Design a protein with these regions (language model features):
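Membrane-embedded alpha-helical bundles that constitute the cytochrome b-like, heme-associated redox core
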Residues: 2-200
Length: 200
């Protein structure tokens, strides 16, 4: 496979994720309305849609250690494009957050509650910039890898905390229980891979 075809495949994953996220958000707003209810449903739907891309990005290295094979090799090879696909999909989620904040709040949002999300989007933006090769080269490979590694841990942790909140505080089991179980499984895999000789 040529470098051009591989690069084209990466771009396709990102574009499809972004377009599908937009389509999903538009569908939710069309069916449930453009008010608070429709926007909230769109937020949940786009979060769920983006989650598999994040899981693939975060679990790739552990899968390669624990169960080497074609699937883990593909995930590891496409980890950058999966991460960018997550960023594209979650950008739609951010637009819906902005839409929700523009509506009459019920209940009004608290600054403390918004802080983790704001920080996470800042981290994610930095990761996207570092994924651009000239920027990564100017920053230095070691610093770029460190930012991507720490940023990925941060993003996955914040997403998991959101799932915990959805299950144990808001009791939205139908939406968040299965994703939470998947997130816990990924953490268990990474711990096992970390303890494995030559682990992550």
């Amino acid at each position: 496979m040529s470098a051009e075809r591989m690069h084209g495949g990466d771009n396709a994953i990102v574009l499809v994720a972004g377009a599908a996220g937009l389509g999903l958000a538009a569908l939710c707003l069309a069916l449930a309305g453009t008010g608070q209810q429709g926007t909230t449903i769109g937020l949940r739907a786009t979060a769920l849609f983006s989650f598999p891309f994040l899981v693939g990005t975060y679990a790739a290295s552990a899968l390669a250690v624990l169960w080497p094979g074609k699937l883990s090799e593909w995930l590891l090879f496409r980890r950058r494009s999966l991460g960018l696909a997550f960023s594209a999909a979650i950008a739609v989620h951010l637009a819906l957050i902005a839409r929700l904040l523009s509506l009459p709040p019920s209940p009004p949002p608290k600054v403390l509650g918004l802080t983790p999300g704001v920080l996470t989007y800042m981290v994610l933006a930095a990761m996207v910039l570092v994924s651009i090769r000239p920027i990564a080269k100017a920053m230095g490979p070691a610093r770029a890898r460190l930012l991507l590694r720490v940023g990925l841990h941060w993003v996955f942790a914040v997403f998991t905390l959101g799932l915990l909140k959805g299950v144990f505080i808001r009791h939205y089991y139908a939406w968040w229980l299965l994703p939470l179980m998947i997130a816990m499984t990924v953490y268990a895999m990474r711990i096992r891979a970390w303890r494995h000789p030559g682990g992550v």
